[in-house]
Amino acid sequence: MAVGMENATASGECGEILKPRTDKREYRRIVLKNSLEVLLISDPETDKCAASMNVSVGSFTDPEGLEGLAHFLEHMLFYASEKYPEEDSYSKYITEHGGSTNAYTSSEDTNYHFDINTDSFYEALDRFAQFFIQPLMSTDATMREIKAVDSEHQNNLLSDSWRMAQLQKHLSREDHPYHKFSTGNMDTLHVRPEENGVDTRSELIKFYDEHYSANIMHLVVYGKENLDKTQGLVEALFQGIRNTNQGIPRFPGQPCTLDHLQVLVKAVPIMQGHELSVSWPVTPSISHYEEAPCRYLGDLIGHEGEGSLFHALKILGWATGLYAGEADWSMEYSFFNVSIDLTDAGHEHMQDILGLLFEYIKVLQQSGVSQWIFDELSAICEAEFHYQAKIDPISYAVDISSNMKIYPTKHWLVGSSLPSKFNPAIVQKVLDELSPNNVRIFWESNKFEGQTDKVEPWYNTAYSLEKITKFTIQEWMQSAPDVNLLLPTPNVFIPTDFSLKDLKDKDIFPVLLRKTSYSRLWYKPDTKFFKPKAYVKMDFNCPLAVSSPDAAVLSDIFVWLLVDYLNEYAYYAQAAGLDYGLSLSDNGFELSLAGFNHKLRILLEAVIQKIAKFEVKPDRFSVIKETVTKAYQNNKFQQPHEQATNYCSLVLQDQIWPWTEELDALSHLEAEDLANFVPMLLSRTFVECYIAGNVEKDEAESMVKHIEDVLFTDSKPICRPLFPSQFLTNRVTELGTGMKHFYYQEGSNSSDENSALVHYIQVHKDEFSMNSKLQLFELIAKQDTFHQLRTIEQLGYITSLSLSNDSGVYGVQFIIQSSVKGPGHIDSRVESLLKDLESKFYNMSDEEFKSNVTNLIDMKLEKDKNLDEESWFYWAEIQTGTLKFNRIDAEVAALRLLKKDEWIDFFDEYIKVDAPNKKSLSICVYGNQHLKEMRNDKDKIPSTSIEIEDIVCFRKSQPLYGSLKL
C-alpha cells in the first residue's frame, strides 16, 4: 500500500532534501557569511517569484508592559527603509507589479513574505531585504501604525475564536509567556507606556536591534532562474543583515500547573450555539514528528465513521461536529484538543458526552496502538505528499521557511506531514496523558449569560471556573449511555492505482462531450499537470429551489441532510484524499468531487443513490433544523463590512432572499414539509456537468450516463427534464445611469462599535475590452486606496478595493470598516480619493501607463498551478453561461491594443466623480458609536441621488441586465 520513494531527493549542502517524486523543481541549501540559512528553489515554469523570511522571535518575547510589540514591529517594517525611504513604497511596488505581500506574528516566530511577477523580482527582493538591514521607523508612522494595530484588535473583539483562545491563555501560569495578550492595542502600545514614561518607538528599535539577527532567520527564495544565479542574487542582497549571534529564545515548561488542570470553565460566546472544548497538556509531537503520536490519536478520536465517538453522539442527537488533534504546540509544550459542537440536547447532556469521550479514550487504551492503522495513515500521507498539487509560490515559501528552524534539512519540504516510524510506546505515552487528572474543559454557551462571576480582561469574555476531580469524570463515565464504541474499519478508499491514463485528446479548452434533455457534459482532459487526480462538478438546476424563502430554506435543509446521511461513508473517502461537497447553487444544488481519481466514481455513485433514495428522518431533521436556525441567527453577528456586502448583494441580485425572511420561514417548517417538497424539487431537473483530469472520455460519459439512469430513466424516474421556459438564470439589477444610490442601515449587532461602507460602482456587462480597462483601473488604484485610506487617514484596518462580477455584470467595490469614522465620512473620503486618482491618471506618463499594462498582462498570463485552479476558471464560465474559455487570451489581446487616452476616457465616462455614465451604490452600516450620524448623513443626500428605503421595492422598480446564460 505504500508509495515508492524513488527520485524523491534533491541535493542540499547538508545532505539530501526529500521532495515529491513528481516535483521537477531544484533545491539548494546555503548559509551566508552572516549565518543566514537559505533555501533556494528554481522553478523554470513559474510565472510568479516569491520569498519568505521567518524570524525566530514572536509575541512570547514581548517586553513586560508592551504587549503586542513583536506584532507592532511586523507592521512597522512595511513602511520604509533608508534605501527606499518613500512610505509604503514596498507594498506599492509589489502591488503594481502583480504581486501580494503579507506577514504574521505567532508566539515564537514572525514571518514576512511576498510574491511578484518574475521580471520584477530583483528589485522586490532588494526592497524586502532592507526590512532586515536598515528599516526606517519614523515617529509619525509609529503613531499611525499603533492605530492600525488597535483597529485590528477592535475587529477581533467580537470574534469567539479570538476570545476563547485568550481565555485559555488567561487561565494559565502568569509567569509563562503563553499567558500574555499577544496582538497589542492602543492601551498596551501607547497609553500605558506613556503613563509609565516609556517611549514605544525607542523600545521598538531596541527590540529590533536585540532580536532581529541573521543567525535566527530562515529565508526561502523561489525563483525562475537557475540556482547559481539565484544564489548570487541572495548573497548580494541579504549579506548586509547583521548577525549579533542571538540564540533562538526558549520558553521551557508547560503553561499549566496543577492549579490550571482539572477545571471546568463556563464561558459566554457572542454567537448562538454551544461548544465543548477539552484540552490536555501533552508531550509535543514535534520531537517525534515521524512517529506522529498526536496525528494518530487525532485521526481516531476525530473519526466520523460508524462506531466512532462522533457517530455515537450524532445518533444520540447531541453533536453536529467533532474535531481532534494537537493545538497550540511549540518545541517545549503542546495541547491535545477535542472540540465538539453541541446541539441544544447535547448541551443538556454535557456530562454524558464527556463520559463517552473518556470511554473512547479507554477503548484506545485497551486496544493498544495498531500497526495497520498507522500503516493506513502513512500510506495516505505518502500518497498526498508525492502527488501533491503545486500551490502558489508564496504559500509554498511560507510553509518551508517556517519549517526550517524546526526540522532537519532533509524534511524541510515535508515537515511533519509524512508519518513513517511506527513506535507504539511514543503514541502510548501521549495517550496516557489524555487522562482525567490532566484535563481542562471549556464549555461555551449563551445559556450561561448571567451565571458567570469573572471577566477575561482583554476581550471581556464572561466566564466562571470550578474545579473537578478524576472521580467526577469517573462518575460521568459510569452514568453515560451504553453505546458500542469501536475502532474504524479499514479504509476502502485509499488509492492504490496512481497510473496516468493514455489521454489521446489534447483539448486545451473544455469540449461539449455529451448533451441530452437531462444533462450536459463538459470534458477537459489533463494536458498540464499529470497527476492521478480528477475534478468533477455537477450543478442540479432545479427551478423550485430558490423560488421563495420557504423553498430556499427547504433546499438548504435538503442539502444539509444529504451530507448528514452520507457522512459516515464519505468520511473515509475524505480521509483518503478524495474531497467532496454538496452546497446550494444559484438555481439548485451542486456536487463537487476532487482528488485521486482511482475510486472517485464509487463515491459519486453513492451520492447519486442517496439523492435517489432520499427520505426525511424526523430526528435528523430536527437536529439539522436547529443547526441551520443558529446559522441564520448568527448572521446578526457578522462584521459590519460583511453585512454591508450582503445588503449590496440584496440590491443587485434578482433571486436571493433576506436572511431575516428565511429565518422566519424556517421557524414554521417541519419534517413533513420537507418530505413533500423534495419530490417536487427534483421533479424537474437539468444536470450541468464538468469532468476534468485523469479521466478518459468514455469514463466521463459513463459517469453522467449513470446519473441519468438512476434519476431520469429508471422505471420510476425521480427527475424529468426541464421545460424550455424553466431554464432560469440569476439576473442583476441595473442601477440608474448618472445616479448615486444610498442605502442606510443600523448594524445588526448593537454591541459592535465598528461601522462599514461598501462603495460600489457598476460599470458594464461582460465584454473583453471593457473588462480589461476595469481590471487596469483596479490594479493601479488598489495600492493608492490602501495607502491613502488606511495608512494615511487611518480609517480602518479593513480597507480594500476589488473587482466585482455579479453574474457577468462587472464593477468595483471599495470596502472599509472603521471604529473611528462613520460611513458618511468614509464615503466622502472615497470620493476624495477618486478625485486624487483623476489627477494621477491625467498626469501619468506613457511609460508608466505601458508598465502598468505590461504588469496586468503578466498577471493575467499567470499559469494555473494545479487542476483545481484550472477547473475553477472553466466552471465559472460554464455556470455564468459565458462559455468564453479563451477569455484570458482575448482580454490580453484587448490590453495590448489599449491606448492611454482610451483608458482615461473610460475612467472619465464610468468611474470618476460625477462621470456621465456612472452608476454608484453606497451601502452604509452604522455601528453603535456612529448611529447619531445616520440621520444627518441622510439629510445631506443631494436631490439628484436616490435613497433606497426598501430594497425589495427598489429592486422591483429597476430594469435587469440581460442574462448571459441562454
From Swiss-Prot:
- Gene Ontology terms: biological process: proteolysis
Query: Which molecular function GO terms apply here?
Result: metal ion binding; metalloendopeptidase activity
So what EC number does this one have?
A: 3.4.24.-
Cofactor: how and how many bound: Binds 1 zinc ion per subunit.
Cross-referenced Pfam families, in alphabetical order? Peptidase_M16, Peptidase_M16_C, Peptidase_M16_M, PqqF-like_C_4
Q: Which family does it belong to?
A: Belongs to the peptidase M16 family.
- Record keywords, A-Z: Hydrolase, Metal-binding, Metalloprotease, Protease, Zinc
Residue numbers annotated as active site? 74, 145
Task: Cite the binding residues for Zn(2+).
Answer: 71, 75, 152
Under what name is this protein listed? Insulin-degrading enzyme-like 2
Q: Which SUPFAM superfamilies match?
A: LuxS/MPP-like metallohydrolase
Entries under InterPro entries matching the protein: Metalloenz_LuxS/M16, Pept_M16_N, Pept_M16_Zn_BS, Peptidase_M16, Peptidase_M16_C, Peptidase_M16_M, PqqF-like_C_4
**Co-factor(s):** Zn(2+)
Group of enzyme by EC: hydrolase
* GO CC, alphabetical: cytoplasm
For this protein, the record's PROSITE patterns field holds:
INSULINASE
